């Protein structure tokens, strides 16, 4: 049985799919842990090539021997809601002004996408979490 590697750190980043490069925020975050930055950038870009244009969160586990593994997450719920609503950003005062409306079907579709990353037992609970995110952005769910 192989011995377990000892974890030296955990790094969480949100990077455009297929566009990781050594510039900030990627370079400094990985550099302080001694990780080969170009190796990560090439692996991340290859893994996210088919999702270009989206922000993909990544969780990088760095080991003491300076090797690493990474796990891709689903795009942020806020970004998916903005895409579904067709707007660039939410409002400054979300509970006073509402910008746009999305349907429950769109919310359920986003919930199905995000289900793996949400702390929800079923799609209805996940949809309620997404609806709460929408409300906090000034998006009405109907």
UniProtKB/Swiss-Prot annotation:
Keyword Ribonucleoprotein belongs to the record: yes
GO MF terms, alphabetically ordered: large ribosomal subunit rRNA binding; structural constituent of ribosome
Single GO BP term: translation
Alphabetical UniProt keywords: Methylation, Ribonucleoprotein, Ribosomal protein, RNA-binding, rRNA-binding
Highest rank taxon of the organism: Bacteria
Coiled coil is among the record's keywords: no
GO cellular component, one term: cytosolic large ribosomal subunit
PTM characteristics: One or more lysine residues are methylated.
UniProt-listed InterPro entries: Ribosomal_uL11 (IPR000911), Ribosomal_uL11_bac-typ (IPR006519), Ribosomal_uL11_C (IPR020783), Ribosomal_uL11_C_sf (IPR036769), Ribosomal_uL11_CS (IPR020785), Ribosomal_uL11_N (IPR020784), Ribosomal_uL11_N_sf (IPR036796)
One Pfam family in the UniProt entry: Ribosomal_L11
Stated family: Belongs to the universal ribosomal protein uL11 family.
Biological role: Forms part of the ribosomal stalk which helps the ribosome interact with GTP-bound translation factors.
Subunit structure comment from the entry: Part of the ribosomal stalk of the 50S ribosomal subunit. Interacts with L10 and the large rRNA to form the base of the stalk. L10 forms an elongated spine to which L12 dimers bind in a sequential fashion forming a multimeric L10(L12)X complex.
Name of the molecule in the record: Large ribosomal subunit protein uL11
Source species taxonomy: Bacteria, Bacillati, Actinomycetota, Actinomycetes, Mycobacteriales
Gene: rplK
